[in-house]
Amino acid sequence: MIKEINIKIKNFEGPLDLLLHLVSQYEMDIFEVPLVPVIEQYLIYIQTMKELELEVAGEYMLMASQLMLIKSRRLLPTVTETFIEDTEQLEYDLLAQIDEYRKYKMLSQDLDELHQERSHFYSKAKTEIITDETVLLQDKSALDLFLAFTKILELQRQHFQDENTKIAAEKFTIADKILELSTRFTEQKICKFSDLFSSSTNKDELVTTFMALLELIKNQQISFSQGELFGEIILERKETSE
């Protein structure tokens, strides 16, 4: 029942935007960033998009194929000096694209801030209309939530594969998981993101739990925060006003 909710990531404009976010987590010069871990995170992200039955645009898949080429060349034994030079050139070209995109984003943000300042003196800014059935991940912190789930999904997938015992397939619905999470947060105001998935028995339950969480976040029943880079995401029940 995964398709009950549609997910969109606002202001996430393409593969370079995702790569820039992944690279920025290292807080160092772009050309010094370890590229293989970034590539692995990107590929896991794409795989998770498919697991959630979300449409993956062609440009993401094209970038994925380029990244897989770079990663495979990194893993192959050194053949010739030309091979090394070609691989290094591929990596440099990719990082140069990301750096160029970063500069574009900075300029775009500056222009947007200028536009916002000018709009105060003129007409009211237009309002974006969002349909009720859409779960909108509104900023890059929400992207961090999504990326955190990709890591859990990858780890748990391996765990499920390693399990020798076969458990009868159980059907999970988003509605049931919403009720389960609501009950949990009634009893426990604060919870670690990773703890929500610790008792999941299969991939379907993982995904359904995540979709239910997104619905609760959309309805402003749950908030989330991340205290430090790569740190644990903390979920908290929002108090309802009487």
Swiss-Prot record:
GO BP terms in the entry: cell division; chromosome segregation; DNA replication
Main location: cytoplasm
Alphabetical UniProt keywords: Cell cycle, Cell division, Chromosome partition, Cytoplasm
InterPro entries: ScpA, ScpA-like_C
Record's keyword annotation contains Lipoprotein: no
Pfam families attached to this UniProt entry: SMC_ScpA
Listed GO CC annotations: cytoplasm
Highest taxon, organism lineage: Bacteria
Subcellular location: Cytoplasm
Family from the record: Belongs to the ScpA family.
Subunit structure: Component of a cohesin-like complex composed of ScpA, ScpB and the Smc homodimer, in which ScpA and ScpB bind to the head domain of Smc. The presence of the three proteins is required for the association of the complex with DNA.
Task performed by this protein: Participates in chromosomal partition during cell division. May act via the formation of a condensin-like complex containing Smc and ScpB that pull DNA away from mid-cell into both cell halves.
Protein name as catalogued: Segregation and condensation protein A
